[in-house]
Amino acid sequence: MIELQGRKIALIGGAGFIGHNLALTLAEMGAEVHAVDSLQVNNLGAFSNSHEDANKALYLHFIHDRLRLLQEAQIPLHVVDARDYHVLSRCLNDMKPDTIVQLAAIAHANRANKDPYSTFDHSLRTLENALDCARGLKARFIYFSSSMVYGNFDGEAVTEERHCEPLGIY
């Protein structure tokens, strides 16, 4: 198993579904984890300010629960918009992580395809900024993607050797 004791890890998109679960697991394994999230996409800001949605109360409950779990685990949450290079760079330079994990993205294929500009802005812009910050800090970089990049595939699993055939911008 990888030794994480004493490693400082920044999770960009760390308050999302995968991000908060990863943060909790890494912290349990001894890493010093920092969640970096704007709380704008697939998150508190998006749902609390949205129009009436039948699932709004449920989504808000999930989001509040994520934030509570991060707080209880004493994982710092840096509310930072990773689309702004200067703000993200300042945050990460102050933090000095050993590893940066990029999780920030529009997490719903239908929403992503309906608003490609926002998807590009929240997914690729944050990726570009995170990569540049990692290079400057000489930090390891891990990028989380989605099985959606492989398109429709047969079977239960797909390997990284499979050719990418994305069906949309997501």
Residue spans of the language-model regions?
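N-terminal Rossmann-like NAD(P)+-binding domain of SDR-like oxidoreductases, especially those catalyzing
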Residues: 1-170
